[in-house]
Amino acid sequence: MGSVLGLCSMASWIPCLCGSAPCLLCRCCPSGNNSTVTRLIYALFLLVGVCVACVMLIPGMEEQLNKIPGFCENEKGVVPCNILVGYKAVYRLCFGLAMFYLLLSLLMIKVKSSSDPRAAVHNGFWFFKFAAAIAIIIGAFFIPEGTFTTVWFYVGMAGAFCFILIQLVLLIDFAHSWNESWVEKMEEGNSRCWYAALLSATALNYLLSLVAIVLFFVYYTHPASCSENKAFISVNMLLCVGASVMSILPKIQESQPRSGLLQSSVITVYTMYLTWSAMTNEPETNCNPSLLSIIGYNTTSTVPKEGQSVQWWHAQGIIGLILFLLCVFYSSIRTSNNSQVNKLTLTSDESTLIEDGGARSDGSLEDGDDVHRAVDNERDGVTYSYSFFHFMLFLASLYIMMTLTNWYRYEPSREMKSQWTAVWVKISSSWIGIVLYVWTLVAPLVLTNRDFD
């Protein structure tokens, strides 16, 4: 009897795994909107890929695989274990993930509502999609080496640059939303408490930035030949000061009363992170001390020599992973009623936007049904661009690939080396980020015929 009930329970998941029905949720979870649940599932799948890539970079993993009798090729096995671990494995895994999301992005172009047959592929058929993704990843491991790694390094660098820009847009949106929320609460009541919270958060961000600048000058500008680092730190510091001053100018405050120093402080902290991340990729090791060497635990170079494995757990890599996770999940759960996010996701037709808030009661969720389903809230129009969402995850896959391999390039001498290209990609992205933020401040003054509310 128990087995029959178990089979019936499993059968209830078949529409989720193999059909276009809204995905079933676990009983402990509240019913949610299909638009949010779908994005979270895709983001979680990408997170699983990140975890697998991290496992592939664990030191000694190849040695452990070699211990499996008959598994590795060098023991007359069938699997070349040297390509299952290390940076090459990360490149191939991320190549498979990137191709999976790119194919979905191309397939979902111009989907306007969930009534489009292609929307069924986006919101359902999970078993087949993930099976296809795994097949693509496995196939990537059979790609001949040739110039694959070199070409994919440059593709990954370009994609990671684009994803950093998306991170910046999401960060600007988050900063504006954060400030707007706290200002509203301050105006509604208990103004002293919320004003203190707003002031404390702003001061903390600027304090962290100031401490970072001091540490940068102390540890990343010596010897005297580290002129590039001095220029990077000085220029970005001046740009952040200029953006902060601009955010509180009377003209800016008049056109955008809720712009302020909180948003500027968030952008300043992120700019300092990008500056630090860029300096850690400098080929000149004297200007690029590791965090462990700074705090006195290690005096070795951050660039691995011949025979050494890539250490993906460098501090800047860990922070990059954390920011990646926050941005991906923020973009997945962000409600669609924010105009800046709508512009980012290319959902320009405001009349088709549906609020991502409460569940619809149009029969999608039957009363008294104790099975929790994701409610289809996109019958009248999508809440986000399916195509752009997948394209963003495509770029995220490339960003993860570059982050886990520390933006190193594999040389014919079998060494992993930092490249000035990676330095300039990160520094230029920090400058573009400040320009984007300044544009959000001055746009209402320049484009007076447009509504920026």
From Swiss-Prot:
Residues 2-39, 110-123, 173-197, 253-259, 331-387, 448-453 are cytoplasmic. The chain crosses the membrane at residues 40-60, 89-109, 124-144, 152-172, 198-218, 232-252, 260-280, 310-330, 388-408, 427-447. The keyword Membrane applies. The modification Phosphothreonine is found at T352. It is a multi-pass membrane protein. A lipid is attached at G2 (N-myristoyl glycine). Glycans are attached at N298. The modification Phosphoserine is found at S351, S361, S364. Keywords: Endoplasmic reticulum, Glycoprotein, Lipid biosynthesis, Lipid metabolism, Lipoprotein, Membrane, Myristate, Phospholipid biosynthesis, Phospholipid metabolism, Phosphoprotein, Transmembrane, Transmembrane helix. GO terms for molecular function: acetyltransferase activator activity; protein-macromolecule adaptor activity. GO terms for cellular component: endoplasmic reticulum membrane; membrane; plasma membrane. GO terms for biological process: membrane biogenesis; phosphatidylserine metabolic process; phospholipid biosynthetic process; sphingolipid metabolic process. Residues 61-88, 145-151, 219-231, 281-309, 409-426 are lumenal. Its main location: endoplasmic reticulum. It holds the Pfam family Serinc. The keyword Cell membrane does not apply. It is found in: Endoplasmic reticulum membrane. Enhances the incorporation of serine into phosphatidylserine and sphingolipids. Belongs to the TDE1 family. Interacts with SPTLC1. This is Serine incorporator 1. It comes from Homo sapiens (Human). The lineage of its organism: Eukaryota, Metazoa, Chordata, Craniata, Vertebrata.
